[in-house]
Amino acid sequence: ITGADGRLATVVHPTAYVSPTASIEKGVVVLPKAVINTDVTVKRGCIINLGAIVDHGCVIEQGCHICLGAIVKGENRIAALSKIEAGEVVQLRQCHVNK
């Protein structure tokens, strides 16, 4: 999402929870009831969809889509441009590759 000045906007729905220790880069969209927990990093251009949960210490690399209701358990790194499908659960310390 870009503003009139061409800069990337970050959008967080009011019903989403983003921990104060999380880092959200520009161009990220966090949809209703999504949760981004402690010490998570979400890089540029990601979508954290409805009800998705990204747990403590995760890194979501650039351009990822964490789909509806997906859960990324703690300490995972999701590779750039990956899509975590609706309802999918990414287990502890699993490195996820693009798909």
Predicted regions, residues:
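Terminal amphipathic alpha-helical/low-complexity segments used for targeting or macromolecular assembly
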Residues: 1-14
